[in-house]
From Swiss-Prot:
Its EC number is 6.3.2.6. It catalyses: 5-amino-1-(5-phospho-D-ribosyl)imidazole-4-carboxylate + L-aspartate + ATP = (2S)-2-[5-amino-1-(5-phospho-beta-D-ribosyl)imidazole-4-carboxamido]succinate + ADP + phosphate + 2 H(+). PANTHER family: MULTIFUNCTIONAL PROTEIN ADE2 (PTHR43599), SI:DKEY-6E2.2 (PTHR43599:SF3). GO terms for molecular function: ATP binding; phosphoribosylaminoimidazolesuccinocarboxamide synthase activity. It comes from the Archaea. Keywords: ATP-binding, Ligase, Nucleotide-binding, Purine biosynthesis. The keyword Nucleotide-binding applies. This is Phosphoribosylaminoimidazole-succinocarboxamide synthase. Disulfide bonds: none annotated.
Length: 243
């Protein structure tokens, strides 16, 4: 399947139309950004590792009854996916308090959150992705109450499945963000990606960071080692690809 027209050139991914009106090609680039794109670097093979990690996690979710937009991975950094009408909401699930949560609220760093916090942000760079609530979502026409409830339910199910899967690999899923869209039938399914770019991942023994937070903290030389470590832990040896 060949890529045709560029329809979205994001911070780290490019999306193209294909000869199938119901499918798109998502190209994972080697770009790494922070601070709403204010800081940008290129990390060798980062796009491929993110695509491979996302593919594995999408397959795990599919095996557990959670529909995703994934179709195929013809190249290590190229994903063929179902075309979705994306909902401009980032759904964030937090299992452990850290990051922006402890900066905004009186809660100690490292506090286990039980039940997990589900947060929704407006995906809009020009407004710096402000936090939403149900009333704002409905006022902006982003989703109905029924859809808000569905997004919450799906995000918590994703959290349940991936927390267990990753812990078996010695990784704590601290928090993560996901995006959803509607397919040609109007069904809401998981889209975009799930990778160390959009998750906080800690080693379960040392609590070392294995995600993009390393880049945010200026530890550029440790970033790709962490991404490779995640890949090596979650991909069985017989499925590994030499990059």
């Amino acid at each position: 399947m060949d890529k045709k027209e560029l329809i979205n050139n994001g911070k780290v991914k490019s999306v193209y139309t294909t000869d199938d009106e119901n499918a798109v090609i998502i190209e994972f680039r080697d770009d790494m950004t922070a601070g709403d794109g204010a800081r940008k670097e290129v990390m060798n093979k980062k796009g491929s590792y993110n695509a491979l990690i996302s593919t594995k996690l999408f397959k795990v979710l599919e095996e557990n009854g959670i529909k995703t937009q994934f179709i195929d991975l013809p190249e290590t950094n190229v994903m063929v996916a179902k075309k979705l009408e994306m909902i401009p909401i980032e759904v964030i699930v937090r299992n452990i308090a850290t990051g922006s949560l402890i900066r905004k609220y009186p809660i100690a760093d490292g506090t286990k959150l039980d039940p997990p916090i589900v947060q929704m942000d407006f995906k809009a760079d020009e407004f710096h992705d402000p936090m939403l609530n149900d009333s704002i979502i409905k006022a902006l026409g982003l989703a109905t109450q029924e859809e808000i409830d569905e997004l919450t339910e799906k995000a918590l199910k994703i959290n349940e499945v991936l927390s267990e899967f990753l812990l078996e690999a010695g990784i704590i899923l601290v928090d993560f963000k996901v995006e959803f869209g509607k397919d040609k039938n109007g069904e809401i399914i998981l889209g975009d990606e799930i990778s160390p770019d959009g998750c906080r991942l800690w080693d379960s023994e040392t609590l070392d960071m294995l995600d993009k937070e390393l880049f945010r903290k200026g530890k550029d030389n440790e970033v790709m080692d962490a991404y490779v470590e995640v890949y090596n832990r979650i991909i069985p040896d017989d499925e590994k690809i030499e990059l």
